A protein has these predicted regions:
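Serine-esterase "nucleophile elbow" of acetyl-processing enzymes
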Residues: 1-50, 54-56, 62-75, 79
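Alpha-helical cap/lid subdomain in secreted, periplasmic
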Residues: 3, 40, 58-214
């Protein structure tokens, strides 16, 4: 019988898709290629959709995840979730209604992680800073670092409560002066240097490495 490699489904928004990284295709694609250097290493499925928030990911994750086991009875052994930035955006003005208010976001994330965690291993990578001087995005959406920080803290609480590994990225990036040059001109997406930084953090994330090698 042929032994299949493990599969890791990476699901989320444009960050997973790799938007902004014209050199390496994004942190997820960089990780896929890096892991692909080992013939027996896990296979990464990259399922990022631009504009997705917690509600859209919640509606599609199970079908997407379950259909990538490569054989009829097999299911991917883990999910890496990266979502939330789009939910933080205020509509119309800086103090406008959020795409999803923070309490609704926390509730939605709790449900989503609980569903995922009942079927497979779950890892969470959180948010990245924005360039507030470039707002509004698309003429109507206001992203701010205060919003990102608040939503990321809620994400951490949910992950801690459900014993799910999370990789905090916002505060580390925000405190790094170089990161101001790692955001594209639209103000919300990382450029190639930013994606490379995320890739390096994931590559050295001990708990993900242990899962990969187990």
């Amino acid at each position: 019988m042929i032994s299949l490699p493990k599969q890791l489904v990476v699901i989320g928004d444009s960050s997973v898709y790799g938007w902004g990284d014209n050199e390496g295709g994004g942190w997820c694609e960089r990780l896929r290629k890096d892991w692909g250097n080992n013939q027996n290493g896990p296979v990464i499925y990259q399922l990022g959709v631009r504009g997705d928030g917690i509600e859209k990911v919640s509606s599609r994750w199970e079908k997407e995840w379950s259909s990538r086991g490569e054989t009829r009875r097999n299911k991917p052994k883990a999910i890496l979730l990266n979502v939330g930035l789009n939910d933080t955006a205020a509509i119309g003005q800086i103090n406008g209604r959020h795409q999803l208010d923070i309490d609704g976001f926390e509730y939605g994330l709790e449900r989503l992680i609980n569903e995922m965690n009942s079927q497979t291993n779950v890892f969470v990578i959180v948010l990245t800073p924005v360039d507030e001087s470039k707002m509004p995005f698309a003429g109507c959406l206001w992203y701010s670092n205060d919003f990102c920080n608040s939503y990321e803290r809620r994400m951490e609480e949910v992950c801690l409560n459900q014993n799910v590994p999370f990789l905090p990225t916002f505060r580390e990036l925000y405190s790094d002066q170089r990161s101001k040059n790692w955001i594209t001109n639209d103000g919300i997406h990382l450029n190639s240097k930013g994606h490379f930084w995320i890739f390096q953090r994931l590559k050295s994330w001990e708990i993900l490495t242990k899962w990969k090698e187990s």
